[in-house]
């Protein structure tokens, strides 16, 4: 049986993860779910934010479902040495899983166009998947230093790094509309010249059915808000992807509607992109939609169960229309929204 490791974490993480697990059990009752610790709570219990017991459990996982990590700015956790802070546990988790491709869907749900800061006619029907390279580029290269009044970082990519993340983008496009926009700055950066060359060569060799075009990152930063429907799958490197994915995250109108997946050669990591929201933790009012949509991504990309993933996506869309949560202008709390999703899936609306 497939095994999913859950890491509820801190703040509202346990609440939204519990909701997500109920949905997972409904659509995939054969999956074994096992909970482990991460983040600030893990430090309190084990003396480290990414305990050995959690690290060992990942070896048997088919997928990992993460809640949220971290506390308030003035929390005692933030006074710890950096390597013991909750966020260090998250970085160690991603490194342990070897996740090199981050998938960030940007979808405006039908009937919720009014939440977007864009005009309704621009927001309507937006459905973008941003595929970001996660382990290379300027963030990870060790050729970096501050020397007096001079500092430098190095952006470096190899063909193998480019190809492995491009394969994820092309594979995703095959499940969608068959269009990939590769984003670079090849007019001024040699590393982007390599990126463009290798992405094009891979497409021409193995993915000839995919329509590929190349755009500069500054152009995409403008067009993703001026004409977002022009995009299907966006593929880009680490730095550009970090910026573009956060820019695009405002389009749906709430971080509570933003799931994500990080994929590598082993178990994938699936998580909502919102923070731990310690100000509302324990009140039962957190929006679990992103965590539940992360289950949809887990089913699709982690367990290869596309039909179950589609069922979750449809149920969430219906629940958002019928029982919007407080951050979306409605009144539903965590349990009420979860009941609505389970009802849409044909389940008993009972929620513990």
Curated annotation (Swiss-Prot):
List of residues binding NAD(+): 71-87, 275-287
The reaction(s) this protein catalyses: (2R,3S)-3-isopropylmalate + NAD(+) = 4-methyl-2-oxopentanoate + CO2 + NADH
Signal sequence region: none
Molecular functions (GO terms): 3-isopropylmalate dehydrogenase activity; magnesium ion binding; NAD binding
Swiss-Prot/TrEMBL site (Important for catalysis) positions: 139, 185
Pathway stated in the Swiss-Prot or TrEMBL entry: Amino-acid biosynthesis; L-leucine biosynthesis; L-leucine from 3-methyl-2-oxobutanoate: step 3/4
Keyword NAD: yes
Xref: SUPFAM superfamilies: Isocitrate/Isopropylmalate dehydrogenase-like (SSF53659)
Cross-referenced Pfam families: Iso_dh (PF00180)
GO biological process, one term: L-leucine biosynthetic process
Keywords: Amino-acid biosynthesis, Branched-chain amino acid biosynthesis, Cytoplasm, Leucine biosynthesis, Magnesium, Manganese, Metal-binding, NAD, Oxidoreductase
Entry's cofactor comment: Binds 1 Mg(2+) or Mn(2+) ion per subunit.
PROSITE patterns, per database record: IDH_IMDH
Positions contributing to substrate binding: 94, 104, 132, 218
Cofactor: Mg(2+); Mn(2+)
List of residues binding Mg(2+): 218, 242, 246
Compartmental location: Cytoplasm
EC identifiers of the protein: 1.1.1.85
One GO location term (cellular component): cytosol
The protein's assembly and partners: Homodimer.
NCBIfam families xrefs: leuB
UniProt function note: Catalyzes the oxidation of 3-carboxy-2-hydroxy-4-methylpentanoate (3-isopropylmalate) to 3-carboxy-4-methyl-2-oxopentanoate. The product decarboxylates to 4-methyl-2 oxopentanoate.
HAMAP family listed in its UniProt record: LeuB_type1 (MF_01033)
Name recorded for this polypeptide: 3-isopropylmalate dehydrogenase
The species this protein was found in: Deinococcus radiodurans (strain ATCC 13939 / DSM 20539 / JCM 16871 / CCUG 27074 / LMG 4051 / NBRC 15346 / NCIMB 9279 / VKM B-1422 / R1)
């Amino acid at each position: 049986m497939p095994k999913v490791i859950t890491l509820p974490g801190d703040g509202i993480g346990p609440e939204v993860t519990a909701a997500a697990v109920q949905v997972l059990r409904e659509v995939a009752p054969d999956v074994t779910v096992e909970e482990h610790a991460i983040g600030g709570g893990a430090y309190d219990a084990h003396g480290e934010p990414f305990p050995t017991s959690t690290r060992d459990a990942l070896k048997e996982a088919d997928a990992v479902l993460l809640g949220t990590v971290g506390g308030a700015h003035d929390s005692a956790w933030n006074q710890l040495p950096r390597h013991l802070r909750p966020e260090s546990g998250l970085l160690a988790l991603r490194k342990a899983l070897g996740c090199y491709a981050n998938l960030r869907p940007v979808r405006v749900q039908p009937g919720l166009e009014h939440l977007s800061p864009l005009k309704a006619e621009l927001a309507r029907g937006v459905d973008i998947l941003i595929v970001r390279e996660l382990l290379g580029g300027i963030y990870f290269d060790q050729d970096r230093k501050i020397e007096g009044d001079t500092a430098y970082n190095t952006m470096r990519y190899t063909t193998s790094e480019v190809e492995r993340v491009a394969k994820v983008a092309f594979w995703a496009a095959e499940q969608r509309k068959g269009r990939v926009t590769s984003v670079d700055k090849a007019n001024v950066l040699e590393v982007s010249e390599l990126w463009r060359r290798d992405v094009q060569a891979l497409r021409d060799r193995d993915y000839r059915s995919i329509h590929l075009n190349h755009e500069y990152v500054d152009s995409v930063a403008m067009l993703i808000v001026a004409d977002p429907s022009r995009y299907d799958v966006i593929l880009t490197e680490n730095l550009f992807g970090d910026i573009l994915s956060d820019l695009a995250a405002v389009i749906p109108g709430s971080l509570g509607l933003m799931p994500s997946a990080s994929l590598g050669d082993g178990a994938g990591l699936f998580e909502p992109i919102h923070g731990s929201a310690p100000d509302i933790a324990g009140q039962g009012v957190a929006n679990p939609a992103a965590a539940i949509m992360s289950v949809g991504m887990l089913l699709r990309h982690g367990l290869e169960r596309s039909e179950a993933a589609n069922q979750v996506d449809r149920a969430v869309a219906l629940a958002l229309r019928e029982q919007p949560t407080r951050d979306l202008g409605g009144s539903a709390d965590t349990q009420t929204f979860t009941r609505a999703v389970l009802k849409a899936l044909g389940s008993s609306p009972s929620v513990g």
